[in-house]
């Protein structure tokens, strides 16, 4: 598949909110500034979960249901975020 077709496919899929097996939930702000808060208050989600914008100035946010470590979510809430030389950030979980 040519690069341009892949980019168009990604752009078509991006606006859809999703939650994957790693516990990553991506949400789109409503442009009013409190859209993410309203999303987190629904159901059993905790408003105090760590969230960050994917890119500064963008309307997308990334929230972890466990622990946020750099740009990824750890497998469990009791994991710690550590920096590995040459590999970057990663989660360290006690068994």
Swiss-Prot record:
Protein name: Alpha-conotoxin GeXXA
Signal sequence extent: 1-21
UniProt keyword annotations, A-Z: Acetylcholine receptor inhibiting toxin, Disulfide bond, Neurotoxin, Postsynaptic neurotoxin, Secreted, Signal, Toxin
Highest taxon listed in the record's lineage: Eukaryota
Subunit annotation: Homodimer. Pseudo-homodimer (identical sequence, different post-translational modifications).
UniProt family annotation: Belongs to the conotoxin D superfamily.
Positions of the propeptide removed during maturation: 22-45
Record's GO cellular component terms: extracellular region; host cell postsynaptic membrane
């Amino acid at each position: 598949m040519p690069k341009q077709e892949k980019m168009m496919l990604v752009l078509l899929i991006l606006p859809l909110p999703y939650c994957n097996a790693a516990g990553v939930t991506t949400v789109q702000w409503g442009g009013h500034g409190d859209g993410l808060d309203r999303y987190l208050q629904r159901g059993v989600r905790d408003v105090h979960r760590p969230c960050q914008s994917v890119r500064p100035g963008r309307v997308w946010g990334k929230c972890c249901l466990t622990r946020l470590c750099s740009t990824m979510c750890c497998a469990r809430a009791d994991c710690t975020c550590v920096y590995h030389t040459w590999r970057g950030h990663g989660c360290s979980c006690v068994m």
